[in-house]
Amino acid sequence: MDGESWYAKDRPPGDRVWRHLQYESYIVNEILPRLPEPPLAAGASFGALHSVLLAARHPTRISGYIALSGAFDTSKWLNGYHDDNVFYTNLVEFLPGLNDEAYLGPMRAQNPKVIATGADDPNVEDSRRVAGLLQSKGIQVGLDIWPGWAHDWPYWKDMMRRYLS
């Protein structure tokens, strides 16, 4: 999906964000209603973004998240383009101003709340930043920085095994 949205450099930035929102809408309106209970959202890299973004934008619909090596600052892929859709799909932009207890209360109740990355991962600062923003809202998210671990599937497989066990 990210190849049709965030990574689609041949498309105008506004179209990329809109495509992401279509994907999110599909999950929220077509998949989640068919589940017996709110699921755990988990993913790596852009999947980590999707996990935490769903948990923040739809906190009563997601039970918790495990986000590995997240690329959380979506502005990097939009060439300076900005509108309301960009704002509300960029965790580093909208979390600082989020003060609505209708969102924050359910976000605090989510379990687990894990953001993990490797010390050598190119997105380590994004992970630190988003975890700090969540913690500043009273959301007890675990931030794990794995020594020497980088941005790759073998590492994520080991990480996910640990967090799911």
Sequence positions of predicted segments:
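Non-catalytic cap/lid and distal C-terminal segments of serine-dependent acyl enzymes
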Residues: 1-165
